[in-house]
């Protein structure tokens, strides 16, 4: 069968692979476009395997929501350039929507979820790797499924937040989600802060005090320490922080004024916890030249 330009074009549009790759696939499969597409998919899987050990620390946080059900997914790429590629962005949206419509509890479970096309998330990932030429990883999935007030917020594709409120409205929930994105509080309220953390901070504050302060009566010393600890606890709790949309009040005051309560939240930031590889090209050249 003759391999025409229109056949190559059709395969390119269908698979996103390069022109020469599509032509080769059609030649290898006697012009059968379905077999050629499958051949390219298998080639994509091979490329994915070769790239699997490369660090993917850039990427995007994507979200999907339907009522009180919402998800955040983190999908990583190797470079910020690919993180802005339309194929990558489309893939992250596919992953988020697939997560929303599945029962997958984490990223590992999500890999085997089937799309409407019949392929799995893992198979689609491999196909996108073939298009963009970088290692991609579906790294994290978090979800909230509740009858309460739920908001999903993503800032610049880099930080995502899910927050659940009992009471309040959509505007308040979104505002609280924006605050969490900006301020990254580890805990909701003071009672959530581990006792070990408080004890350690007390120890540190006491060590920092002057001998003159340490010589003060026990009850005064306790008041000084308690004041410092209270300030620290406010800094690490959502409720204790000044509300970014109205710094005249704390988040707790804003929430209680609306007759609401924050039940919990999830926050993801692209690449957090991943050690990025810092290339030292000078050292690499020296090593290859036997000078290091």
Curated annotation (Swiss-Prot):
InterPro entries listed in its UniProt record: EF-Ts_dimer_sf, Transl_elong_EFTs/EF1B, Transl_elong_EFTs/EF1B_dimer, Transl_elong_Ts_CS, UBA-like_sf
Key words, A-Z: Cytoplasm, Elongation factor, Protein biosynthesis
Cytoplasm found in the keyword field: yes
Chain segments carrying region Involved in Mg(2+) ion dislocation from EF-Tu: 79-82
GO molecular function: translation elongation factor activity
UniProt subcellular location: Cytoplasm
GO cellular component terms, semicolon-separated: cytoplasm
Chief localization: cytoplasm
Similarity comment text for this entry: Belongs to the EF-Ts family.
Function (record text): Associates with the EF-Tu.GDP complex and induces the exchange of GDP to GTP. It remains bound to the aminoacyl-tRNA.EF-Tu.GTP complex up to the GTP hydrolysis stage on the ribosome.
Name of the molecule in the record: Elongation factor Ts
Species the sequence originates in: Xanthomonas campestris pv. campestris (strain B100)
């Amino acid at each position: 069968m003759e391999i025409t330009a229109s056949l190559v074009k059709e395969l390119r549009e269908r698979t996103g692979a390069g022109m020469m790759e599509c032509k080769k696939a059609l030649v290898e499969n006697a012009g059968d476009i379905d077999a050629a597409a499958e051949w390219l998919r298998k080639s994509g899987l091979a490329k994915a395997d070769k790239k699997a050990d490369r660090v993917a620390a850039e990427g995007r946080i994507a979200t999907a929501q339907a009522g009180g059900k919402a998800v955040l997914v983190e999908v990583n790429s190797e470079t910020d350039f690919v993180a802005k590629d339309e194929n990558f962005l489309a893939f992250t949206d596919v992953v988020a929507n697939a997560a929303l419509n599945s029962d997958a509890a984490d990223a590992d479970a999500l890999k085997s979820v089937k799309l409407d096309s019949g392929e799995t998330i893992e198979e689609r990932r491999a196909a996108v790797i073939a298009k963009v030429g970088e290692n991609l990883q579906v790294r994290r999935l978090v979800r909230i499924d509740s009858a309460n007030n739920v908001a999903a917020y993503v800032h610049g594709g880099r930080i995502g937040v899910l927050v659940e409120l009992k009471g309040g409205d959509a505007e308040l929930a979104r505002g609280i989600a924006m605050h969490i994105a900006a301020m990254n509080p580890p805990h909701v309220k003071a009672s959530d802060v581990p006792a070990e953390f408080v004890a350690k901070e007390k120890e540190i504050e006491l060590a920092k005090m002057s001998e003159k302060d340490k010589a003060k009566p026990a009850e005064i010393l306790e008041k000084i320490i308690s004041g410092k600890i209270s300030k620290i606890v406010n800094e690490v709790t959502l409720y204790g922080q000044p509300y970014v949309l109205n710094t005249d009040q704390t988040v707790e005051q804003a929430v209680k004024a609306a007759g609401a309560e924050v039940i919990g939240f999830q926050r993801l930031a692209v690449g957090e916890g991943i050690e990025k590889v810092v290339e030292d090209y000078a050292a690499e050249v020296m090593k290859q030249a036997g000078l290091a």
